[in-house]
């Protein structure tokens, strides 16, 4: 392998490990925040859904009025829906997304990478067409 190609690979590997490692602290913070928020919102949704379904007025009044009568259920459910529509769960797995997409691209060049961004050079496949 040429020295310039080797230097390019090393520079690419340094940059990839830098990008992956820079996501780790924010990913950890998002995981903690998401765990707290999702548990709180899930508990609120579950408990308020129980009261909402047990309310005798639920079967009589229109849905919008029923949701207006039970604001905790409405807000908790809307919060969960909005969080997932915005893709909050992707912030938790950002480094894995980056490394998996990089592996797909590197596969064309007979390479791969580990979860930290270190390059893995695969041995070349030999073409034995001799009979």
From Swiss-Prot:
GO terms for molecular function: protein phosphatase regulator activity. One of its GO terms (biological process) is lipid metabolic process. Pfam families: Tmemb_18A. Its main location: nucleus. Keywords: Cytoplasm, Lipid metabolism, Membrane, Nucleus, Transmembrane, Transmembrane helix. InterPro entries: NEP1-R1. GO terms for cellular component: cytoplasm; endoplasmic reticulum membrane; Nem1-Spo7 phosphatase complex; nuclear membrane. It is a multi-pass membrane protein. It is found in: Nucleus membrane; Cytoplasm. May form with the serine/threonine protein phosphatase l(1)G0269 an active complex dephosphorylating and activating lipin-like phosphatases. Lipins are phosphatidate phosphatases that catalyze the conversion of phosphatidic acid to diacylglycerol and control the metabolism of fatty acids at different levels. PANTHER family: NUCLEAR ENVELOPE PHOSPHATASE-REGULATORY SUBUNIT 1. Belongs to the CNEP1R1 family. This is Nuclear envelope phosphatase-regulatory subunit 1 homolog. It comes from Drosophila melanogaster (Fruit fly). The gene is Cnep1r2.
């Amino acid at each position: 392998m040429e020295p310039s190609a080797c230097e390019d690979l090393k520079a690419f590997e340094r940059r990839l490990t830098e990008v992956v490692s820079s996501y780790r602290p924010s990913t950890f913070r998002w995981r903690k925040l998401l765990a707290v928020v999702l548990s709180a919102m899930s508990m609120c949704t579950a408990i308020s859904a129980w009261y909402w379904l047990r309310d005798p007025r639920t079967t009589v009044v229109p849905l919008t009025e029923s949701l207006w009568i039970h604001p905790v259920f409405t807000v908790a459910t809307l919060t969960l829906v909005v969080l997932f529509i915005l893709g909050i769960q992707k912030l938790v797995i950002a480094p894995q997304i980056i490394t998996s997409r990089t592996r797909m691209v590197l596969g064309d060049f007979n390479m791969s990478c580990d979860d930290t961004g270190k390059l893995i050079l695969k041995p070349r496949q030999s073409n034995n067409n001799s009979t």
